[in-house]
Amino acid sequence: MIGVNILSVVTMRAEPSDKAEIVNQILYGETFDIMEENEKWSKVKLKHDDYIGWIDKKQWKKAEQHQQTTNVVKEIFQPITIDDKTIFAPMGSFVEKRKLHKIDYKNSILHDAKLLLETPYLWGGRTFM
């Protein structure tokens, strides 16, 4: 079975426990194979880098097919609409073009870089969240 992340960022852990080490983060729209499940956790293997870890079962949904979109969020956060709700997908997330809201930064690279200054390191992190 193939799953897709439905939240801004999902924490991937080394073991099926909220206290386990964070090993990675899954960004909105990223897909993965479901390898194993228990009552609360799903063991997943990411499609883009084959990373394996455990995520909470409530934080993903079944994907109809493996269809990774090629539209990548380039802003620090990109508001997107999902089922009449707005969430903020972090930079690097994959989104469908029709779900994007227009954001126009004249100097986006410099602007985004300044926002990331002094961001603390997060083991296993892929965003500053």
In which residue ranges do the predicted regions lie?
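Basic, ligand-binding patches in group-transfer machinery
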Residues: 29
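Catalytic cores of peptidoglycan-degrading enzymes
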Residues: 112-129
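SH3-family beta-barrel domains
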Residues: 1-16, 25-26, 35-38, 45, ...
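N-terminal charged segments
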Residues: 22
